[in-house]
UniProtKB/Swiss-Prot annotation:
Family the UniProt entry places it in: Belongs to the GmhB family.
Cofactors named for this entry: Mg(2+); Zn(2+)
First-tier enzyme category under EC: hydrolase
Protein's organism: Haemophilus influenzae (strain ATCC 51907 / DSM 11121 / KW20 / Rd)
Protein name: D-glycero-beta-D-manno-heptose-1,7-bisphosphate 7-phosphatase
The keyword Metal-binding belongs to this UniProt entry's keyword annotation: yes
Length: 184
């Protein structure tokens, strides 16, 4: 069984400008790539789990999302960071057409994490969810991951978020240091 870091995207890995779907508007948060590289060296799989309601709302197409995701994946790979899995939810209960759905994959539900756990043979009791919203943490809790980490690089941290997070960090950049300290 593998251990993994489940990663939200917008506000965790990249600056959240709102419905980011174009390469020109995608900017990694300072230090994120180095942190991801360090987490890989520590033996963690890196698994992206991202809600993309902009697809359901008609703000951008699934093809536009996939094009940006492919670019992001290549950008990381060029810097020795390989994502082991990419999972996304294009649905929203108030969406349009085929994407209007109250699904099991949209965080705070745990469907994306549970699918990754099954497909990638991940041990949730050795794994971590990192995100900038309560919904991210609730998905991690529902999937029974070992640790849920809230980062301050996206949405404002709420009291509810602080209450359910195992750690609240300024950025994912701080996570490798915390994990090394806990290992001692």
């Amino acid at each position: 069984m593998n251990k993994a870091i489940f990663l939200d995207r917008d506000g965790t890995l990249n600056i959240d400008y709102g419905y980011v779907h174009e390469i020109d508007n995608f900017k990694f948060i300072d230090g994120v790539i180095d942190a991801l590289r360090e987490l890989k060296k520590m033996g963690y799989m890196l698994v992206l789990v991202t809600n993309q309601s902009g697809i359901a709302r008609g703000y951008f197409s699934e093809d536009q999302f996939l094009q940006l995701t492919e670019w992001m994946d290549w950008s990381l790979a060029e810097q020795d960071v390989d994502l082991d899995g990419i999972y996304y939810c294009p649905h929203h209960s108030e969406g349009k057409g085929e994407y209007k759905e109250d699904c099991d994959c949209r965080k705070p539900k745990s469907g994306m994490l549970l699918q990754a756990i099954k497909e990638l043979k991940i041990d949730p009791t050795q794994s971590i969810m990192v995100g900038d919203k309560v919904e991210d943490l609730k998905a991690g809790i529902g999937a029974k991951v070992k640790m849920n980490v809230l980062v301050r690089t996206g949405k404002p941290v709420t009291g509810e978020g602080e209450g359910i997070a195992d750690y609240v960090l300024d950025s994912i950049v701080d996570l490798p240091r915390i994990l090394k300290r806990l290992k001692k």
